[in-house]
């Protein structure tokens, strides 16, 4: 659990304890209790995106140190795959109605052959690399040119819930950032989320071509998004680079961006409710004093966040 998680959970629990004897705050206490539980269980989904055959699965396999993910031979077989650490290795295939089918870890190819039947799958692996990046959960995404239904399922699920995106541009196949690629990145940028662009398959290109592709991509991203990060160059053995990208993600800042606005809003709504109550209790001195004490404590918490 990160420091920010601990801090926000502690803040939420303190606010609940302070307000628990104030009847007018019962609804807000329930909301804050749910929010605190959400913070405790929050994962950081990091999708790896790009066109079909841009090297997403190969990159993740190299990071894991073994061939876990099948390399799709056609876009139709692609499905969003979450990779999670667990002592109990298994596959969970989740349908559109949230029902779950459980498979043996060795049945991944069979599950992917029925990709159209599922919304996404969760792959639980006893892999130390996945344990080391927790609470980050890597997601191997369908390519941009996957069937519309598969692509839309992935976008609907992971565009809102993904907190950081790793975007692969195949130097060998795509060579340039297309309008379609820009549209995909704009969906991330418009939500105020960050991405890291990587040019993959550079081992298949001469150095002069790599520099040209990188230069054009950098200019395009600067113009479209004000992108200032360096562009990573990936070959067929770049698992260590992916590991560095993941470990360089500022997860404390991510938790702050996700939850600080919600915690602050909840405390301010409590304050507003208390103000209304104080006005209504202006002739009941003791109740008003109690409400003021609660308000003072909540205001102090807002200030300290």
Task: Locate predicted features.
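Globular "head" domains of long coiled-coil molecular machines
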Residues: 7-10, 33, 37-261
């Amino acid at each position: 659990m990160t420091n920010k998680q601990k801090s926000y959970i502690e803040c939420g629990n303190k606010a609940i304890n302070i307000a628990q004897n104030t009847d007018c705050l019962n609804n807000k206490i329930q909301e804050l209790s749910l929010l605190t539980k959400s913070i405790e269980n929050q994962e950081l989904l990091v999708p790896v995106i790009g066109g079909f055959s841009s090297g997403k699965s190969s990159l993740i396999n190299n990071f894991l140190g073994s061939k876990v993910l099948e390399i799709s031979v056609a876009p139709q077989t692609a499905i969003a795959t979450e990779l999670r650490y667990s002592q109990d290795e298994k596959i969970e295939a989740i349908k559109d109605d949230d029902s779950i089918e459980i498979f043996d870890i060795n049945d991944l190819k069979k599950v992917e052959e029925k990709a159209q039947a599922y919304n996404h799958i969760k792959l639980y692996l006893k892999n130390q690399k996945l344990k080391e990046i927790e609470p980050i959960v890597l997601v191997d995404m369908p390519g941009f040119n996957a069937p519309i239904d598969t692509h839309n399922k992935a976008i609907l699920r992971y565009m809102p819930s993904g907190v950081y995106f790793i975007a692969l541009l195949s130097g060998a196949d795509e060579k340039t950032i297309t309008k379609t690629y820009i549209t995909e990145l704009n969906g991330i940028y418009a939500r105020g989320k960050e991405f890291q662009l990587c040019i993959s398959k550079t081992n298949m290109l001469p150095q002069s071509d790599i520099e040209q592709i990188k230069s054009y991509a950098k200019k395009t991203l600067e113009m479209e998004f004000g992108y200032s990060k360096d562009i990573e160059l990936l070959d067929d053995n770049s698992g260590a680079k992916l590991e560095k990208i993941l470990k360089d993600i500022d997860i404390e800042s991510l938790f702050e961006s996700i939850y600080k606005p919600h915690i602050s809003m909840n405390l301010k709504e409590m304050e507003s409710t208390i103000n209304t109550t104080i006005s209504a209790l202006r002739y009941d001195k003791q109740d008003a004093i109690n409400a003021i004490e609660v308000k003072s404590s909540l205001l102090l918490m807002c200030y300290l966040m």
